[in-house]
């Protein structure tokens, strides 16, 4: 796994999640259901922090209750607890980090700033997307310092920023000290992600295509400079080709829809893809979870599970979540419209995150499960938008 050309050398950012699951294995053995129950705990904490974020943004119990209802009603996030990857743990650390950032405007600013950085740093270790949140946070801290001239706060920002910048080198030296043959600087994933993010793949526009990394290692061996040059050249060629063929708008329409107009945000895909990547044999233990029963002999799910995953029950869930998705986006839009003239830093932070990530993923390799974070962060905004819209409707009827 750790040797050159293998998983970790290609994806060094996955080291923390590998170590995380090693830790779970040490505690629980290879009991995958125990891992999924850990995800359930994280899920409850995600709900908790989304509600806390809502209470900071609005300080209205009705809006907090609406946020809780939105959390519970999004079935696909509950499905994600079966997906043993970094998604659910990272969502927890991200929501906690955002809460402590917003809370530093109200009480114990230094303590909450430090907690926010710690939680978001943990989130970045598990999911690199959280770096965007850290950058947004640092920008707002700098703007705050310009207004307040608070030396203690800016010192925390400076120290944290330096640590974030140096963290890749720290990780590289730590891993290299364990095995001198490993050098994480040889990773070319940035270039690979840009190539895939600007080209069509078998799964979707801008998605991970599965062929480019093996091609690079076969073509260039250990010559990482040549790999990087190939990646940059292909990215430029991809964009030029899309423009020349008048397919740029079509490409980004497909990519954006697959990321943001995806009702279950790949919730069901993540737990079924392993079973039937090419409609072939799968590993039943990789997606079993209590009531999901699997017929090992015939390689089929039970009738209920099959209906839940791909049948009529699934169709009803997707239909319902499609309606929910429209409510979420419309509610968030109402929030922006109703608060446009009284936007404080607290109220603008989550929209700023959404916009920043949207722009980042225009070029970067992406798919629906990457954007689920930004989707659930809209819940507190949607709750306030719905409540404000209801007030307007009631007042107009009087």
Q: For the regions a protein language model found, what residue spans apply to each?
A:
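Membrane-proximal stem/loop segments at transmembrane-domain junctions that anchor or position
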Residues: 2-3, 177-294
